[in-house]
Amino acid sequence: MDRKDFIKNSTILGSATILPVNNVFSRGVNENGIDKLVDNNGNFIQKSLPYNKTFLEPHMDEETLHLHYEFHHGGAVKGANKDLDNIKKHLKSGEMEMVDLWTRKLAYHFSSHVLHSIFWTNLTNKKTQPKADLLKQIEKDFGSFDKLQAYIAKVSKSVEGSGWGILGYQPYSQSLTLLQCENHQKLTQWGVIPILVIDVWEHAYYLKHKNKRGDFVDTVLDIIDWDNVADRYNTAIKLR
């Protein structure tokens, strides 16, 4: 079995990643853009940012964006490839304890890859608003856009340690839900498709905001690309 088939058939060996590789995310908003997580040979890949590294200034500085994308996100992609190679190697030799170790590492690294890839596309350099079907769903599930904003802010600012605030679509209940994810893979819900994510690891904000996570979250909420979120929502609801 080659690497591509191994990934496809294993759906990451049942690890606690948010989505299997071939789910709606990898078929998502732009097949040839940053949403493409895997190449034709089954290797995890990091596509280019959808904008230059000064695009988000002054909201997000160039140095933070460079370090975050190149080393933290990039490191997760390298880690996921290493993890998968080690899983295959130890499966072949029958060392199941090592398979367990590398499967847990893959859950961490691949979930990081998924969330970072969504995060970059969720951001723009101007204020936008949700509209049309997405706005109707927000109002149905949260009462109003303002209430959703307050809820996302609270969830993101209150993550214990490092993690993410996540707005996702739950196809089983046909509703939007908010998750408070620790690390990249803990406290998730099976089936939820992330459509908006906020990274609250310190590497996302410390150079500019120091220890003031709340200020960073408020800044991010001012530059969410709600058109991108709507695209992800419209893709996700097709699973109903």
Regions flagged by a language model, labelled:
Residues D5-F25:
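N-terminal export signals
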Residues V21-P58:
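C-terminal segment of N-terminal export signals and the immediately downstream linker at the start
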Residues D39, F71-G74, I87-L91, M96-Y169, ...:
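All-alpha RGS (Regulator of G-protein Signaling) helical domain and cognate RGS-like helical scaffolds
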Residues E62-H66, T103-R104, D225:
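Second-shell loop/turn segments in exported
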Residues E63-N81:
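Structured secondary-structure scaffolds
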Residues S156-K157, G161-K210, F216-I224:
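An amphipathic alpha-helical core segment
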